[in-house]
């Protein structure tokens, strides 16, 4: 039947394969295959075509419903780096992702200049993407103009029915194309593996399950090509903007989309670098929201805290152990009978909770609580009564849909209804008057439902069953019925995958309105563009060594999806962790963008101070994280303005190194901080891959690896240590470790200058108050400083300069750089000393040299610590360090 994967096209291995592929694409397809092009109108960058069902017969796979007989295709080069191709019913409107979810140009706005009989190729001198339509049978290709590399090459067997759409694109031979993305799933590898099906239907399935559809839907992939006509490391992106359920089948030499509704709305992003792809992608879907500075600290949570005294004991335990604790969280335990916007009057009464939160705030700490979408059906519950009065709940069969979640019977707000967002905002504001929480965690928003609603009509059980839960369960399983009706008559069938996005947006906007400060929202369910409003965590993982590794894969995937504030439950959520696993997990988790310890009720407690070995690891790893806070926050600025992930795969910085394409046991923070964690029990070493260049330890600043080509190195990994290195060519801004970020921000600044092999280095620093709603906006105060370093006079002189790009944040004018660490110095002979000049004036700075012993480079001088400086961050400076002989 047509629902099966098509036979993959020939793999282009040699002239015979090319010839056979040409025959395949030129074959006279019968009535059961695809469409023909009836007419074309176009200009050089816009095209419109009418497609008609081939042969006039009954079409393909009649068991899936009748084919739509006439289709409309629009293609437009919307920017120099973005191509939009949309295929829909020519005669009847169909559901599409709403404009207010992803604001985007209408295809019609690009088609005014088209003319009948226009060309069948879109190509401009400024765009690297070329679109070509082939007429009989219909198919289309997307090509990189600069190299001729075919990026997307559809086969002629397009299927378009009311509730089943299928399209296949061939791919280069396995080994040339490396694909990443298509989530949300827990995957064993970051790079997608062939012969796998990626199902997109938001579901409450624990993240400890591998290869199943989880909480979010992101029909986007990045393709990085190696060798061939495209050149090494050229990347592009493909988005199918569709909120309906789907299976995406990656067969190695092809990718097939099987979608149960909506339209085929494709966007192609030219890259060619991986960073350029995410820049172009987030230009369309929206830039990631700026996160408050404090959210980059360490967070502690547990499902199962018993009362306020339990919370107080945890906070005290961290303080006594001298382990940073930025944010305390509570799960649903704090609620009165699990009802949103309430406090348990016995265990978490307001007269105990308010002083507890006030004490956190006085100590520079924050408090976050969970809320769920289900509103308990209870006429004595004010939130329910107000929701009923405003008529904002999801409908089914003419009435409010009745589900069951933690508080029992519930109704669910319909966030497509404008009144629902207003209702939500008022409830949040009223709750914050009782308890001034600093952020909100929105959970169970797939929507999760403890009962399976029976099918009401055909859309509850469509003719094609996607691979829901890995066993093709009905789409109503553990959620609300697909036949439920949203505001405006929208079926849940179409809007299901949007619920988490819409709730996160409403929560973000409510916090912004109530506090006037930058919101912090953590959402379990996400969709394309959710990063504009929310952070995400990987969900209910398991306390296993496998999940420790898999957390890196999910973290890197969400960086591609435009949600850079991402992390996993440290030490594992489900099941009992072990001391060794927890120790190694905090070593990794300290470098997640979002770093939180969280565990399930009934499992062994795992606060980081409970085992001394874990506490040692936590102090060491979190101590380094807190020193790196200025760097992490600057990466947040980069993410907010360009879409760049905070945590990145190695190929983002080294796209020409094919060895990096399969690496998912290490990752980069930004462009040059490499984290190489231990991921197996009993290990005392770790084998890490180092791309070409110089790599310095971030613990003692010594040169650890110097290589002209990438190589694997076995490193010591003592029980309390995670290997973290910085690549030569980077300048990092550090501050002094403390137990809260507010204390860190008051400390002196250090510059780490890691010189590349050519003696140069660069870096950036972004500063603001960490909580203004805008980050680098016209109404906010902020400073941006660029640093550069270079050796002169054969290496005997090192110059470090700053350039103030923007300076309206007053504290930058008083922040002092007290030390500059120069890493990677070389000298033919040891110098007698150093002379230090600031802005041309010699200063009385102290200089110490060390770290040359055991260096992998000849002539290595090691590390020079230049202390006693008083350089002002917000004022440009020119620091010159001269070796004297």
From Swiss-Prot:
The keyword Cytoplasm does not apply. Residues 1-33 form the signal peptide. GO terms for molecular function: alpha-1,4-glucosidase activity; carbohydrate binding; hydrolase activity, hydrolyzing O-glycosyl compounds. It comes from the Eukaryota. The active site is at residues 443, 446, 540. Keywords: Glycoprotein, Glycosidase, Hydrolase, Signal. Pfam families: Gal_mutarotas_2, Glyco_hydro_31_2nd, Glyco_hydro_31_3rd. InterPro entries: Gal_mutarotase_sf_dom, Glyco_hydro_31_AS, Glyco_hydro_31_C, Glyco_hydro_31_CS, Glyco_hydro_31_N_dom, Glyco_hydro_31_TIM, Glyco_hydro_b, Glycoside_hydrolase_SF. Glycans are attached at residues 195, 378, 397, 467, 477, 576, 844. Its EC number is 3.2.1.20. GO terms for biological process: polysaccharide catabolic process. The keyword Metal-binding does not apply. It catalyses: Hydrolysis of terminal, non-reducing (1->4)-linked alpha-D-glucose residues with release of alpha-D-glucose. Belongs to the glycosyl hydrolase 31 family. This is Probable alpha-glucosidase Os06g0675700. It comes from Oryza sativa subsp. japonica (Rice).
